[in-house]
């Protein structure tokens, strides 16, 4: 990847809103160049201030864990998506441990805040993300802040 390009992997358990988040982030800023399906790798890119961000979304189902490993190769940053209505699950913890074991810097987006909440201090008690942003991907809440945080950490 070129110097002014970064790879961001969007990762999380099943049905947390990864694809919706990617679609709305990219629709909000730029044009989606390609959209995959959830059983494969979702992809979209956008350019902000001469920096091209390549977003790769991983499937959340357990049977596709191997695809997470593939997607994480050569990544600059990961975005972990949590579902506020479910709280922090065992699978969420496993994903974060995977990123930390690979020394991949990551941020957290707590999604679906319209139907639940996760206390950020609870998250910071077990992991060390670069940032935590709360919002609702469907309503596009928190996406401007999220893009700004991603830009400042990549």
Swiss-Prot record:
Keywords: GTP-binding, Nucleotide-binding. Gene3D superfamilies: P-loop containing nucleotide triphosphate hydrolases (3.40.50.300). SUPFAM superfamilies: P-loop containing nucleoside triphosphate hydrolases. GTP binds at residues 12-19. One of its GO terms (molecular function) is GTP binding. To M.thermoautotrophicum MTH765. This is Uncharacterized protein MJ1339. The lineage of its organism: Archaea, Methanobacteriati, Methanobacteriota, Methanomada group, Methanococci.
